[in-house]
Amino acid sequence: MQDEAVTENTASTGPQAGPPLVVNVQYVKDLSFEVPGAPQIFAALRTQPQVDLNLDVQVRRLEEQAHIYEVVLAIRAEAVERVEGEEKANTVFIAELSYGGVFTLNGIPDESIEPVLLVECPRLLFPFARTILATVTREGGFPPVQLQPIDFVALWQARRAQQQQETVGNA
């Protein structure tokens, strides 16, 4: 008799929509590694290059009828050697990586979609992008670029603050 009650309760809950966040696929969307001064740069490099990093999160909805999105981490690492007495720095290498994922959101409230796409999805992609960038720079003949953990919450909040300032400025 108890089994019947459990069966009835289970049946009344309806079909499950699946997990709230599904990673459908992850992929390298674009990858570029340039050493403009090769091969001379390897003999001429006198100091540890300074690596300037730029990271952006891009989101695009793939299907209007479903909550399916592409999230891309766009990372640019440019290593330069600043030589004392010279005005212009020498570019050692430029690495650019766009690492993407396709995500399906199930049953996530509308007010939570933006932080999931701009914080949680990049957090899932980041370790893979970090490894790819380190491998590419190492295989390019340089010490691997080791990205430190990124505070995606702070990036998202900064983006929102900038958008609010632009909205106020245009009003």
Curated annotation (Swiss-Prot):
Keywords: Chaperone, Cytoplasm, Protein transport, Translocation, Transport. It comes from the Bacteria. Signal peptide: none annotated. GO terms for molecular function: unfolded protein binding. GO terms for biological process: protein folding; protein tetramerization; protein transport. GO terms for cellular component: cytoplasm. The keyword Protein transport applies. The keyword Cell membrane does not apply. Gene3D superfamilies: SecB-like. It holds the Pfam family SecB. It is found in: Cytoplasm. HAMAP family: SecB. Homotetramer, a dimer of dimers. One homotetramer interacts with 1 SecA dimer. Belongs to the SecB family. One of the proteins required for the normal export of preproteins out of the cell cytoplasm. It is a molecular chaperone that binds to a subset of precursor proteins, maintaining them in a translocation-competent state. It also specifically binds to its receptor SecA. This is Protein-export protein SecB. It comes from Granulibacter bethesdensis (strain ATCC BAA-1260 / CGDNIH1). The lineage of its organism: Bacteria, Pseudomonadati, Pseudomonadota, Alphaproteobacteria, Acetobacterales.
